């Protein structure tokens, strides 16, 4: 049994590690939001120093002795205590395995990469981005080798985000989903092509878009005292404390801005909704990877694309954008949910989104298996887009430069979106079993049934459990992709 004294020490270390992470996330937020270009380099150095401080804490004699005394322990007073120990052991092992100099180099590369990506994207210049990409991938491979030299580098990188899965499992899950998506796509492509989605295009000024996306957040009951909205080309959500989560959107296109803010609000709600015990223990913020993406994808698709959600938002949209007064809600929803294969992941329809994810996962895997280089990666990208979606990018912006992930160090992350879709469908199935009137109430303006169910069964626990444990605790089952496939069939074939 872990002693009270041991757990007090664990809590002290974990909480202080989260302080440092919080400061690093504030820098990350600033780089997205306010930092002038000439400030990026210095902020990168500050971030590297915070990593150094974190490593010093993790590799100290005190932490080493504490971890050694608790490793293998199975008896704890609470699940929160067990979660803190698991968290600390995981962080300790990485700190011991990865030299501080290498981690600092990666932090600087992430800052530099984010800035370089922005410049190269604006210039549509992949050639200048190649050295940045190669440096990132080289550093990621060094990180993977440092963590486990006996494992495939890509397996290690994927497990930094989705710790519960072997590549073989992910391959099988994605293959099953891909087959189902392609089958549905082939069945509906012709009929869906007849839907006029040009109505989604509209001239709306910046302030109008901002008012509408804030109204969407209001419907979802995002707490203004625990969040703030910022604007960015590539929407993200930054968690800077247990009661401080900062979703974003891109206000260039109205409907895209709404869906993006609903997606990021899902992250935001998960980030700040840990219960007090979990928050005070340093386990706030949610489980990264697929579990976090399940919450954003749940809100984007299972809420944000539904009639019930738009019964609340559409009248406001019609008031702010007069053209929609002439368009029925039925017509609007058909356009919103139209299956329309395309090149841009962030603008993908719900059905084909997974194909975008699979392309990225396959490319990462092939690169780290030695089958691709930075000189051949774009050709592979374009070939897969033509094969899976029927389009070849005409430029780099709508092709390989569209995502910021690789530039900012998120390598091995993409499978989390697809797994997150499967998790989200499983959560939706259980939510409806527990609360059959949840969406009826949403249609009447009350999203609290949905929000409270997610908080009670998932959000309040933060990082207390692993993703697989959390899924089983919330739904009573292991991952069952059948729920996701049936959801897609019900939506598009019936």
Model feature map: region roles:
Residues 2-163, 489-493:
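A well-structured
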Residues 2-6, 22-25, 38, 59, ...:
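C-terminal, non-catalytic "cap/extension" segments appended to globular domains
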Residues 42, 105, 132-135, 173, ...:
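Secondary-structure capping and boundary motifs in well-ordered enzyme cores
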Residues 107-256:
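Contiguous, non-catalytic segments that form substrate-binding/exosite surfaces or channel walls
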Residues 174, 178, 206-210, 216-230, ...:
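All-alpha helical catalytic cores of prenyl diphosphate-utilizing isoprenoid enzymes
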Residues 225, 277-281, 305-315, 374-375, ...:
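Acidic/polar loop patches that form or flank catalytic/metal-binding clefts of enzymes
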Residues 253-275, 293-297:
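Active-site recognition of the HExxH zinc-binding catalytic motif
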Residues 285-326:
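Post-HExxH zinc-binding segment in Zn-dependent metallohydrolases
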């Amino acid at each position: 049994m872990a002693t009270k004294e041991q757990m007090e020490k664990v809590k002290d270390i974990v909480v202080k590690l989260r302080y440092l992470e919080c400061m690093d996330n504030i820098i990350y937020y600033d780089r997205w939001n306010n930092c002038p270009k000439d400030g990026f380099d210095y902020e990168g150095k500050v971030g590297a120093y915070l990593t150094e401080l974190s490593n010093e804490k993790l590799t100290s004699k005190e932490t080493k002795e504490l971890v050694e005394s608790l490793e293998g322990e199975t008896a704890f007073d609470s699940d929160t205590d067990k979660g803190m120990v698991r968290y600390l052991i995981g962080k300790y092992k990485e700190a011991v395995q990865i030299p501080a100099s290498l981690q600092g180099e990666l932090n600087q590369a992430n800052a530099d990469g984010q800035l370089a990506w922005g410049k190269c994207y604006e210039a549509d210049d992949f050639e200048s981005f190649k050295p940045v990409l190669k440096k990132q991938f080289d550093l990621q491979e060094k990180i993977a080798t440092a963590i486990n030299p006996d494992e495939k580098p890509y397996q290690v990188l994927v497990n930094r985000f989705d710790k519960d899965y072997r590549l073989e499992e992910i391959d099988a899950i994605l293959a099953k989903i891909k087959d189902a998506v392609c089958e549905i796509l082939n069945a509906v492509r012709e009929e869906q092509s007849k839907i006029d989605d040009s109505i989604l295009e509209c001239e709306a000024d910046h302030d109008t878009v901002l008012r509408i996306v804030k109204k969407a957040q209001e419907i979802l009951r995002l707490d203004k005292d625990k969040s703030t909205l910022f604007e960015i080309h590539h929407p993200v959500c930054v968690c800077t404390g247990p009661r401080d989560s900062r979703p974003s959107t891109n206000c260039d296109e109205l409907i895209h801005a709404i869906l993006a803010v609903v997606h990021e609000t899902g992250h935001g709600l998960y980030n700040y909704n840990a219960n007090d015990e979990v928050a005070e223990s340093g386990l706030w913020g949610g489980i990264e990877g697929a579990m976090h993406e399940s919450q954003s994808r749940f809100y984007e698709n299972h809420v944000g694309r539904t009639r019930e959600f738009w019964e609340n938002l559409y009248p406001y949209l019609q008031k702010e954008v007069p053209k929609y007064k002439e368009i029925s809600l039925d017509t609007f929803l058909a356009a919103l949910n139209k299956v329309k294969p395309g090149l841009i992941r962030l603008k993908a329809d719900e059905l084909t989104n997974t194909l975008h994810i699979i392309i990225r996962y396959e490319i990462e895997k092939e690169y780290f298996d030695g089958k691709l280089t930075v000189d051949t990666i774009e050709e592979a990208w374009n070939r897969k887009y033509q094969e899976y979606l029927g389009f070849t990018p005409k430029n780099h912006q709508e092709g390989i430069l569209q995502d910021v992930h690789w530039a900012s160090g998120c390598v091995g992350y993409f499978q989390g979106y697809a797994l997150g879709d499967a998790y989200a469908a499983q959560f939706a199935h259980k939510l409806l079993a527990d609360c059959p009137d949840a969406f009826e109430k949403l249609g009447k303006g009350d999203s609290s049934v949905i929000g409270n169910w997610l908080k009670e069964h998932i959000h309040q626990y933060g990082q207390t459990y692993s993703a697989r444990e959390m899924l089983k605790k919330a739904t009573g089952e292991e991952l069952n992709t059948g729920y996701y496939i049936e959801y897609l069939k019900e939506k598009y074939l019936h």
